[in-house]
Amino acid sequence: MESLKSTLKGALEAELARIPQPFRHGPVFHQTIKCFLYGMVKEADLWPIPDFKPPRMRDGGFIDLIGVDSSNAVKCAFAVGPVVELKAVKSLEALDLEEKWIITFSTLAKKVKESTFFLKPTIEHLHLEQK
């Protein structure tokens, strides 16, 4: 898992670094990460489904992207945001699968660190550094 995490971190950070300076802001980072994950999930022979709403979530939870196999079983799920949000953690916890990821991209390291309080042991957290 750690090698996948470091590989994914390096690839995503390189992708974000390519964004021209005038366009480097939250929504662009968010969508760029989602687009990258979409391609990665598709390359893994899974069908990427963006903006998934877990069926058991009544409060409007959402997950940015899931990967579904040929039997329609969810194999991986990703939530993306500047910091770890409780809503994202609850949405991921509603799914019964091993590969659950929260990817954060805020430049405010202290806020990201404070927000990891919400994380559960079953969720991988990946923070992307921006240069």
Over which residues does each language-model region extend?
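Hydrophobic beta-strand residues in large extracellular and virion-surface proteins
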Residues: L8, P48, L65, F78, ...
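A short, well-structured beta->alpha microelement
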Residues: P50-D64, V83-K87
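Active-site beta-strand-loop-beta-strand hairpin of nuclease catalytic cores
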Residues: G60-A77
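Catalytic cores of nucleic-acid endonucleases
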Residues: A73-L126
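Phenylalanine-focused residue identity feature
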Residues: F23, F29, F36, F52, ...
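Acidic-basic catalytic patches of nuclease active cores, encompassing PD-(D/E)XK
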Residues: E2-R56
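Non-catalytic C-terminal interaction segments of nucleic acid-processing enzymes
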Residues: M1-T7, P121-K131
